[in-house]
Amino acid sequence: MNKSRQKELTRWLKQQSVISQRWLNISRLLGFVSGILIIAQAWFMARILQHMIMENIPREALLLPFTLLVLTFVLRAWVVWLRERVGYHAGQHIRFAIRRQVLDRLQQAGPAWIQGKPAGSWATLVLEQIDDMHDYYARYLPQMALAVSVPLLIVVAIFPSNWAAALILLGTAPLIPLFMALVGMGAADANRRNFLALARLSGHFLDRLRGMETLRIFGRGEAEIESIRSASEDFRQRTMEVLRLAFLSSGILEFFTSLSIALVAVYFGFSYLGELDFGHYDTGVTLAAGFLALILAPEFFQPLRDLGTFYHAKAQAVGAADSLKTFMETPLAHPQRGEAELASTDPVTIEAEELFITSPEGKTLAGPLNFTLPAGQRAVLVGRSGSGKSSLLNALSGFLSYQGSLRINGIELRDLSPESWRKHLSWVGQNPQLPAATLRDNVLLARPDASEQELQAALDNAWVSEFLPLLPQGVDTPVGDQAARLSVGQAQRVAVARALLNPCSLLLLDEPAASLDAHSEQRVMEALNAASLRQTTLMVTHQLEDLADWDVIWVMQDGRIIEQGRYAELSVAGGPFATLLAHRQEEI
C-alpha cells in the first residue's frame, strides 16, 4: 500500500468520526482533566515531602494536603474510568453507523451481486473488519490531541521551578513519534495483507465446511485439509509479521522514554551534588522541584506511550478500511427507487419493451426482451444455463437495474417503491433459505400476524403436514443452521408454505423442484400449480415434462426470448424448445 493510499484511507476514517464527534470531544476533555489532576497529584506529593523532610513540619500539620492528595487520586481514577466509558460509546456508535452503511450498501447491491463472493468474505467485512476499527475511534483519535496537550501542560507546570528539566523533556519528546512513524509505516500494509488473508481463509473454510460431504465422497478430504492448513499457516505468518512490528515499536518507545527520564534524574543528581548550577533561576535546586520533575517525567511520556500503543489501532483500522472503502465506493448500477405504490392486490399484468437487464457493474445480462404477461396467466421460462432466466426474475424483484421499459399494470417498475412492490411478490427458489429458529417462525417470516388457521392451511397446502408428525416438536421444531434438521425436500416444502401464506400479485419460481426426489418434487409442484392459478406466475425450470397446462412457454437463449407458445405447439414445432425437450428426455 503506497503512502497516498494510506493518507486517503486515514482521511476516510477521520471523516467517519463526525458520526460521534460530541462523544469524542468529551473523551478528549476528560483526558485533559486527567492531565490536570496528574499535575495536582505530583504537586501535592512534592510539597508534602518538602515540608516533611526539608522543613521538618509535623505530619499532623499536613492533614489538609494529605486529604487533598487522596481526593485527587480518587477523582482521577473516576475521570479515567469515565473517559474509557465515553470512548467505548463513541467507538460503538461509529461502528454501528458504518455497519449500517455497509448493510444498506449490500441491500442496494442485491443478491445477484453478493453471490459473487464467498459468504465468509462478507462475514469478515461486516463483522471483523468493522470491529477492528473500534480502538481507532475509542482510543487513538482522542489520544492524538492528548499526546500534544498533556505533555505541554506538564512542561508548563515544571518550567517555573526548573527550566532545565523542562527543556530536557521538551527536547527528547519529538524523537518518539519520529521513530514510531518510521517503524509504523509498514504496519498498515501488513494489517491490510492480514485482513485479505483472513477474508480468504474465512471464505475458503466456510465453503469447504458446507461441501464436506461432497468432498469426502470424491476422496478430496485429505487434499482440502492440506489446503486449509496451508491457508492457516499463511495467516499465521502474516499475523506474526504484524506482531513483530508492534513489539519493535514498543521497544523503541520504551528506550527513548527511559533515556529521557534517566537524563532528568542525572541532572538533578549532579545538581544536588553541586556539580551543575543551572536551571533553577538562582534560587537553588529544591527537593520539591526535583520530586515534581521526577514524578511528572513518566507522566510526560505516558500520553506518547499510549499513542504508540494505539498507533497500531490506527494501522489496523487503515488495513481494515482498505477493502471497506473500496466496497463502499464501487459504482453500482442499482435499480432506481420510486415512490409509487400498487393500489390493488389483484394479479398484475407485466409488459416489457426493448428491455435490457444490467448487472450492478453495468454489464448487460439479458436483452432485448419484448413480452406481455396478462394478469392471472402462468408463464414458464426455459433455456440452457446462463441464458438470462434468473436475471429476469431478479429484475422483476427489483434487485437488478434495467434499461428500456418494464411496466407493472402500466407503471414503470423503476417508479414503484421497492418495499411496496415486494409486498406483492412471493418467491420460491431452488435453494430454500430458512433463517429463523423454528419451522413455525420460518413459515411466518413474511406474515408474523397470520392466524393459526391460516398457518395450518399453508402447511396443509404445501404438504408440510405430511411429515410434521415425524418431527420431535412438530411445527415448533428447531430447523438448525442451514435447515440441517430437514431434508432438502422438506425444507423446500416449508419454503412453499411460506410463499402460500403471503397473498401476492406475482408468484416467482426459480427452479423450485431442482435437486428434489420424485416424491418431494410431486408434492412441491402440486402445491405450486394450485397456487399459480390464483395469481400471475412466472417460473424458471429445466424440467420440461409437466408444462402442458401452462399458458405460455418462453424459450430464452443468449438473453433473448427466441421462441414462445404453448407446450402442444412448441413440442412438435421442431424449434429450440423441441431440441431442449429431446435433450431432457435423453438425460432421463
From Swiss-Prot:
The keyword Transport applies. It comes from Escherichia coli (strain K12). Changing residue 216 to K: Does not affect cytochrome d levels. GO terms for cellular component: ATP-binding cassette (ABC) transporter complex; ATP-binding cassette (ABC) transporter complex, integrated substrate binding; plasma membrane. The chain crosses the membrane at residues 16-36, 37-57, 137-157, 162-182, 250-270, 277-297. This is Glutathione/L-cysteine transport system ATP-binding/permease protein CydD. Part of the ABC transporter complex CydDC that exports the reduced low-molecular-weight thiols cysteine and glutathione to the periplasm. Export of these thiol-containing redox-active molecules may be crucial for redox homeostasis in the periplasm, permitting correct assembly of various respiratory complexes and formation of correct disulfide bonds in periplasmic and secreted proteins. CydD contains transmembrane domains (TMD), which form a pore in the inner membrane, and an ATP-binding domain (NBD), which is responsible for energy generation. Conversely, a more recent study suggests an alternative function of CydDC: authors suggest that CydDC does not mediate the export of L-cysteine but rather reduces cytoplasmic L-cystine to L-cysteine. The principle function of CydDC would be to maintain the reduced state of cytoplasmic L-cysteine, thereby providing an important connection between sulfur metabolism, oxidative stress and resistance to antibiotics. Its EC number is 7.4.2.-. Forms a heterodimer with CydC. Its main location: membrane. The keyword Metal-binding does not apply. It catalyses: L-cysteine(in) + ATP + H2O = L-cysteine(out) + ADP + phosphate + H(+); glutathione(in) + ATP + H2O = glutathione(out) + ADP + phosphate + H(+). Residues 158-161, 271-276 are periplasmic.
